[in-house]
């Protein structure tokens, strides 16, 4: 029930933002002549609420904390029980990613993520707060606490779309790109064998 509601929410969200996928940024003529140069972005663009996401950060130095309202590192084996018997079935790791160069936009097209931008003559790097599944050393990704006699299970990354400064076909623009935000358990019933 929850997963179907989540799927519907994602579909409606994607349809709602489809008309506003690429908000173009102002790029100077010199930057258009030299596409490898660092684009200068108008700081007023960051005042618009629709461009802000707690999972995207522009900073001149690496962030040392999780975003506001974030969940941080979620490792079931190292946490104290905080939720009175409620445990995560998939171990996950959350980190700020600063070396993202390529991403998939909401249209399914691969775009180039701008690693650096100039904001008020300060070179800032674009960081993304991503949560991915923690792979155990054995390589298995079975969900924890699932009855393996009756269920097949594996942990997989779940995604969302966030606004990021990207370049595609020589146009610098805000685009919705896909990032990893959770590690979820996928279940399927084992076939009944007599």
Swiss-Prot record:
SMART domains for this protein: NGF
Propeptide residues per the UniProt entry: 31-79
Intrachain S-S bonds: 90-155, 133-183, 143-185
Record SUPFAM superfamilies: Cystine-knot cytokines (SSF57501)
Major site of localization recorded for this protein: secreted
Region feature Disordered, mapped onto this chain: 56-81
GO cellular component: axon; dendrite; extracellular space; synaptic vesicle
A single BP term in Gene Ontology: nerve growth factor signaling pathway
Recorded GO MF terms: growth factor activity; nerve growth factor receptor binding
Alphabetical list of Pfam families matching this protein: NGF
Top-level lineage group: Eukaryota
Location in or out of the cell: Secreted
Keywords for this protein: Cleavage on pair of basic residues, Disulfide bond, Growth factor, Secreted, Signal
Signal peptide: 1-30
Similarity comment: Belongs to the NGF-beta family.
Subunit structure, as described in the record: Homodimer.
Described purpose of this protein according to its UniProt entry: Nerve growth factor is important for the development and maintenance of the sympathetic and sensory nervous systems. It stimulates division and differentiation of sympathetic and embryonic sensory neurons as well as basal forebrain cholinergic neurons in the brain.
Name by which UniProt lists this protein: Nerve growth factor
Organism in which the protein naturally occurs: Xiphophorus maculatus (Southern platyfish)
């Amino acid at each position: 029930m929850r997963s179907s509601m989540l799927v519907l929410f994602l579909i409606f969200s994607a349809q709602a933002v489809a008309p506003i996928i690429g908000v173009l940024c102002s790029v100077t003529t010199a930057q258009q002549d030299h596409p490898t140069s660092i684009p200068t972005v108008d700081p007023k663009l960051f005042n618009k609420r629709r461009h802000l996401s707690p999972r995207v950060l522009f900073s001149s130095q690496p962030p040392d904390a999780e975003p506001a309202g974030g969940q941080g590192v979620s490792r079931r084996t190292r946490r104290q029980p905080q939720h009175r018997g409620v445990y995560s079935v998939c171990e996950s790791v959350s980190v700020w990613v600063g070396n993202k160069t390529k991403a998939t936009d909401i249209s399914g097209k691969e775009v180039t993520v701008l690693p650096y931008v100039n904001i008020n003559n300060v070179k800032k790097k674009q960081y993304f707060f991503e949560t991915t599944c923690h792979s155990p050393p054995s390589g298995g990704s079975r969900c924890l606490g699932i009855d393996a006699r009756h269920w097949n299970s594996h942990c997989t990354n779940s995604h969302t779309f966030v606004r990021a400064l990207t370049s595609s076909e020589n146009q610098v623009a805000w685009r919705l790109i896909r990032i990893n935000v959770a590690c979820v358990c996928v279940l399927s019933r084992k076939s009944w064998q007599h």
